[in-house]
Amino acid sequence: MAELSTIARPYAKAAFDFAIEKNAVESWAEMLSFAAQVSENETMKPLLSGALSSSQLADLFIKVCGEQINEQGQNLIKVMAENGRLEVLPAVYELFHEFSNEWAKEVEASVVSATELSAEQQQQISASLEKRLTRKVKLNCSVDASLVAGVIITAGDLVIDGSVSGKLNRLSEKLQS
């Protein structure tokens, strides 16, 4: 099977373009998030594999989603059901989110540190990343004591490993070669 993002991209792009046109990016993000959660539900998953006809599946899916999905969102669900693609809704949501961040000139950065970062440290990291990436940065911070000290920052394709454990691993690799 083709990679999920390849299958999901046209749906996400169409939804995003429509959302931009209608000035409804936030509401579409919420709809897609909810639909993605429904598609990942353990009760719903078996039904997505072809147990029902596409129209029955679309009707059931829309009924489960209820008021959370508007008429245009329902149309997307129907098209995806007709094409047997409802299982890629989580990937559609992820891509939609990426398109939205790109459009808003935002990037989410994951910061894993050995200890809790202070607000000042978070601000410094955010400012440095914003300067480097020329985008607004939203930090998602977490703590991993196994890093010993330092941080690992991931923003899109950019990975900055400033952790002591990372430095020790690189040193070990150099010594072994």
From Swiss-Prot:
Membrane topology designation: Peripheral membrane protein
Alphabetized InterPro entries for the sequence: ATP_synth_OSCP/delta_N_sf, ATPase_OSCP/dsu
Gene Ontology molecular functions: proton-transporting ATP synthase activity, rotational mechanism
GO cellular component: plasma membrane; proton-transporting ATP synthase complex
Pfam families assigned to the protein according to its UniProt record, in alphabetical order: OSCP (PF00213)
Subcellular location: Cell inner membrane
Annotated signal peptide: none
Function recorded in the entry: F(1)F(0) ATP synthase produces ATP from ADP in the presence of a proton or sodium gradient. F-type ATPases consist of two structural domains, F(1) containing the extramembraneous catalytic core and F(0) containing the membrane proton channel, linked together by a central stalk and a peripheral stalk. During catalysis, ATP synthesis in the catalytic domain of F(1) is coupled via a rotary mechanism of the central stalk subunits to proton translocation. This protein is part of the stalk that links CF(0) to CF(1). It either transmits conformational changes from CF(0) to CF(1) or is implicated in proton conduction.
Family membership noted in the UniProt record: Belongs to the ATPase delta chain family.
Subunit structure: F-type ATPases have 2 components, F(1) - the catalytic core - and F(0) - the membrane proton channel. F(1) has five subunits: alpha(3), beta(3), gamma(1), delta(1), epsilon(1). F(0) has three main subunits: a(1), b(2) and c(10-14). The alpha and beta chains form an alternating ring which encloses part of the gamma chain. F(1) is attached to F(0) by a central stalk formed by the gamma and epsilon chains, while a peripheral stalk is formed by the delta and b chains.
UniProt name for this protein: ATP synthase subunit delta
